[in-house]
Amino acid sequence: LFVEDYFRDHMLPFVQPVLLVKDKIRPFLNNAQLYLSILLQDKDAPDSPSEYALVKIPSDHLPRFIQLPSPNGEYHMIILDDIVRHSVSWMFPGYEILDTFSLKLTRDAELYIDDEFSGDLISKIKHSLAKRHVGPASRFVYDAEMPVDFLEFLKEVFNLERFDTLKEGRYHNNFDFFQFPDFGLSHLKNPELPPLAYAPLEKTKDFFGAVSERDHLIHVPYQSYESTVRFFEEAASDPDVTHIKIVQYRVAKKSRIMQALLKAIASGKQVSVFIEVKARFDEEANLRWGEKLEKAGVTVHYSFPGVKVHSKLALVRRLENNKEAKLYSYLATGNFHEDTAKVYGDFGLFTADERIVNEVARVFSYLETVKIPEAPFEHLLVGQFNLRENLEKKIDFEIQQAKAGKEAWMILKMNSLQDPRMIKKLYQASQAGVKFKMIIRGICCLVPGKKGWSENIHAISIVDRYLEHARVFVFHHGGEDQMYLSSADWMTRNLSYRVETAFPIYDENIKVEIMESLQLQLGDNVKARILDESLSNTYYQSGNDLAIRSQIETYYSAKRQSDEQINN
């Protein structure tokens, strides 16, 4: 009775039942929307061919999981799909329901711009965005139990090719499990790990003085993002700050950072924002922010043709010591996004080191003028200039060291490794005797551990409660242990078609801190999976009786550091 009442009272306006008739009735399938396909038979014509119908599962309007009336102390749930299944006979009176199968169509969301190099790129992006929701089919996911003739009928009705289809289970859109209620049962939840204060920047009364004194590193989500937000809020309110510059790729809907920029422009400072309007799925939000900032008087620079800007950079100019200009920079592996900073594992560096800040200023000059800087980059590795070339040189140096019988190794952490040229170089290094340890969360097109080919490469992937998003490259380099944090994965799109930035870590204490984090991950024997030739992704077993779950250990290591800072 509850299910019937719920369907009638809440779902009925949204289900849109329709009989499918080849070449006559072809409903439009919304992108990523869940549907129930129905096999039915006319009760008045039992010998006639079966018919087909389609009903929308309204998960875009209602919760995917519905709590049923239950005795005290018990919790019973039903998934929205099954309420629709239960109700289809009511929607098709006069028909016998033979079976039901779930399906979902994903449409191509790529923005196809014929020519980025002529005309108004922003107008072209806006025009392309308007057509995104009606893009061509790219993937048709269906219930594995669906009969072949039913599938063939649907392929014909919706003009699907064989390679568009993907057989899956009875329920789709597993992302919806993020909505699953917790019923207040704390013992079933992960223990809370509240972000930790980074006291040297959050508690200081002289923010820029603290950064001027030494470099500072935050590691989110273990440490609070408050230091990053404060960087902009302090700059906005500090009367000695004259300029603020930032690259915006993705930002939070309610962004304190953007609000700080608006406050800065209102107080008479010069604010310059480079907005990457080709940030996938954030194009509309970025355009809206651009319009808002421009109306407030901010100088806004937008994407330029052929290249995507993925660097995570900010720059502040401040007058100090008899009105002498001093630069401060924040460089990060992740976006200026307060929300993702709660779940993405990223590093952010605050620095006034002239070797770095002067080159950050050159990156901004390039973004604002599209003129190649006269002076080369000697410290930053910047996509479109020296990123790929310098990474290859550093690998070549390790190869030379190994061939000379000297110690040679690298530790590489990134989201994805796909670039064929870099993979070939890594194979060459392995064959020369260079030792590798790699942490690759996502795509890994390199095959580690293959005898005679890549046996010196050990690779793992860690998927846990936080998304591993930081990119870290460490090269032994004859004992120098050169370390870079970066916005770039080793994918062709990052190394060849984006403005990315890899920045060196010069502070020895920060190097130690990052290396300790990497070693915890490399020793993980709870959530780490081995990437190897067999592609089995088996969990790593270290033979150590002590369970090491790197994200939890990283948090408590950061907590010890935070407690010491606060007590001192």
Regions found by a protein language model. Give the residues of each.
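N-terminal localization/anchoring segments of enzymes in phospholipid and broader phosphate metabolism
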Residues: 1-410, 428-432, 444-468, 472-568
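Hydrophobic alpha/beta core scaffold segments
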Residues: 435-439
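Polyanion-binding catalytic cores of nucleic-acid enzymes and NTP/SAM-utilizing transferases
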Residues: 422
